[in-house]
Amino acid sequence: MAVQVISGTELAKKTKSEVAGQIRRYISLGRRVPGLAVILVGSDPASQVYVGSKRKSCAEIGIDSKSYDLPETTTEAELLSIIDDLNRNPNVDGILVQLPLPKHIDSTKVIERIAPNKDVDGFHPYNVGRLCQRIPTLRACTPYGIMKLLETTGQDLHGLHAVIVGASNIVGRPMAMELLLAGCTVTVTHRFTRDLEEHVRRADILVVAVGKAEFINGDWIKPGATVIDVGINRGEDGKLRGDVQYAKAAEKAAFITPVPGGVGPMTVAMLMVNTLTAYERHFNA
């Protein structure tokens, strides 16, 4: 049977349309527009692209995006002071600090400074802890988006063996918690894992997030598996490639996400969902 490509582009479009509809409904009831503060420190080209995409989505669906483009020389104290002001601002529902930050700024301290109820990236220890305790509120956007992509396959995830390649705080670790919550048996692999191939070959669901082009050999994919490729790497030829050898993997998988057009659009869409959630909780507090 031919592989089914899971389109993140289509699902993201649908998701953002639903969020926009909810926002219009709230505004018709006399509520203010949701507010999202987006902070960018420095001029990293990739970060500028990501931030631009997030701001564009806000404009499309009716979220007031407040931009804070700060110079590379911004001190940690200055950034924390801005976050404190935004935490107190009743018109700001979400605060997003684009990572990575310059080396002289402690990203952990910055993430922890954001009020948990405004942490729309889902990185604050409080929100990660709630996910671990099976009571999630604001969830890390990429894993959250991946779970929505998995829903479109129609599979019952209970009891499936999910293997995650990469154990980052942004994707791998919260992804493990999401899949546990969905009833999967979860294996997390990382740079110290021995015999990675053996683990990958057993995966009913494979999530790869290492940032290395075509790191996973397509021949390793278990027949009928679902492959979620989080990586997005630009080669010397200018083409974008994922962390998995797509063509070979597609010969064996039942479902696979493309690069681009797979996980990436859903990450931004779930940021919009989280901002709406924070906005709703603000009024229901």
Curated annotation (Swiss-Prot):
Reaction catalysed by this enzyme: (6R)-5,10-methylene-5,6,7,8-tetrahydrofolate + NADP(+) = (6R)-5,10-methenyltetrahydrofolate + NADPH; (6R)-5,10-methenyltetrahydrofolate + H2O = (6R)-10-formyltetrahydrofolate + H(+)
Pathway in which the depicted protein is active: One-carbon metabolism; tetrahydrofolate interconversion
Keywords: Amino-acid biosynthesis, Histidine biosynthesis, Hydrolase, Methionine biosynthesis, Multifunctional enzyme, NADP, One-carbon metabolism, Oxidoreductase, Purine biosynthesis
GO terms for cellular component: cytosol
Any one biological process term the GO annotation gives: purine nucleotide biosynthetic process
Record InterPro entries: Aminoacid_DH-like_N_sf, NAD(P)-bd_dom_sf, THF_DH/CycHdrlase, THF_DH/CycHdrlase_cat_dom, THF_DH/CycHdrlase_CS, THF_DH/CycHdrlase_NAD-bd_dom
Example of a GO MF term: methenyltetrahydrofolate cyclohydrolase activity
Superkingdom of this protein's organism: Bacteria
Role noted for this protein: Catalyzes the oxidation of 5,10-methylenetetrahydrofolate to 5,10-methenyltetrahydrofolate and then the hydrolysis of 5,10-methenyltetrahydrofolate to 10-formyltetrahydrofolate.
Name under which the protein is recorded: Bifunctional protein FolD
